Amino acid sequence: MSDANHAKKHPELIYDVGMHKGEDTDYYLKKGFSVIGFEADPDLAAYCRDRLSDEIENGKLIIVEGAIAERKSEDDEERTIKFYKNTSISVWGTVDADWARRNEKLGTSSEVIEVPIVDFAACLEKHGVPHYCKIDIEGMDAVCLRALRRFEHKPDYISIESEKVSFDKLVEEVNLLSELGYDRFKAVQQSSIEHQREPKDSKERRCVGYQFGMGSSGLFGEDLPGRWMNDEQIINRYKSVFRRYRVFGDYGILRKTYPGKAIIKALSIVVRRPIPGYYDTHAKHTDTC
């Protein structure tokens, strides 16, 4: 990789790609990490600047406002992109028109605004490669992964919101992570994050007794529960997940009828979380001890 970018890796740094209201950034800062936060929604970015103003002032937090997207070509000089700002569920904002249409089918609406385009590779070059990179930007997660191809060093740990409609796309996500050198994986249910408990012997800086709320991504790195799996094992794990998606998911069999929806609601009450929920894929790099 003689032509790779040699941006330095910083063990004390985390990238929060998709800050929303700063739920995860707050956790990372309290654990003693510095954070580069990315947020496309201007109102949410302003909220985070106000909420975390002290951390910005003391240099522990930098907020990059704008939407991460791939340019159509090297000659593409577009500086803004259409952002579908979800007016019903703020965390569902996206630059992906297909995702926006899916969200409409689920009963939400969006306002289309123009936001600055953020070059993720340029940010990596400027700020360095983080210890952990949390990515959750509604359909654009793979853009960040592809940008990492250019860099010699990779984050020790990375997480993305896993595909939940097309199993082939899910396999593509795992293959892309494998291509980048990630060889250990975990599938983490996100609908029950509020029940996660930070281990007292935290391997990620220090334990701060954090209480995760709605919108949090939860634990990361070596603090995650469960065993690491290889690529074949994680794909088999997701085969089981997708069987549940086909029955209970957004486009599942039971969602198509009123009695089916009632069954899903009843089951959600019993297990005390949404059914079937959704997952983040966490990955550990082969160079990480």
How should these model regions be labeled?
Residues M1-C289:
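Phosphate/nucleotide-binding beta-alpha loop and adjacent structural elements of enzyme active sites
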